[in-house]
Each structure stands twice: as structure tokens, then as C-alpha cells.
Amino acid sequence: ELFHLKTPYLDCPQCFFYNSRALSGTLYIGIAKQEPEGAEPLMDVTENLSDEVPLGCIAVKDYSENTGLLAFLKSIGFITEVVEKRRSGYVEIPICRYDKAVLEDTPGQPGGKV
């Protein structure tokens, strides 16, 4: 399903989630904007950490240009719970449970993959 992404730094209609796996096997989730000629990647949702996150959870990048992303993801029902926060450098990364069905609900993107 397409959604209107709204954070302190971005106000962008016609967005959708896409996903893949990092070389480490960790789930990668990004947000892209649907354009007439294709998709334009906008931002990373997930952060790659040195240690594993609990099963069914992701590490959400909610700092720098992604500030406000966690609140937005909660508002659309994608993030269901923040289970912990982990320090990574100078920031704390929220570790969150998410609704997997949202990734599968992107028109024209089977399984939400680009």
C-alpha cells in the first residue's frame, strides 16, 4: 500500500516499503517513492548493528536525516512495540517489533521487494 511519508525532514507522497537481506543475513527495509518511470529510494528504515536483534524485531534508524521516522512508523501501524534501545556510537537505536503484513501489502511489489 502506498503511503504519504511525513517526518521533520521529508514530506513525500506515493511511498512504499521495500526489503532485502544484508550480506550478514539481517533484514534490510527501505522506503522508496513511486515515480512514473520507476521507484526512487528515499531512506533506510533499518540500521545494521554488530549484534543480533531479537527474532521478529528490527533496529530502526531514527536519527540524523531520519529523525521522526520511528514516530511516523508507529502512526501507520508498522512499528507495534519498542522493546529496547541500544547504544551505537553517539546515538541510541530503537529495537522494535513490526507488522510483517505491511511489507507484503505494497502494490506492484511482490513481498514488498523492489
Spell out what each predicted region is:
Residues 30-78:
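Acidic, aromatic-enriched beta-alpha/helix-loop junctions
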Residues 1, 14-15, 76, 96:
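Short non-domain terminal segments
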Residues 2, 9, 14-32, 38-44, ...:
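Catalytic phosphate/metal-binding cores of nucleic-acid and nucleotide-processing enzymes, i.e., regions
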Residues 1-8, 84-86:
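Short acidic-hydrophobic surface loop/beta-edge motif
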Residues 62-110:
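Short, compact, well-ordered microdomains
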Residues 23, 28, 36, 54, ...:
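Intrinsically disordered, low-complexity segments enriched in small/polar residues
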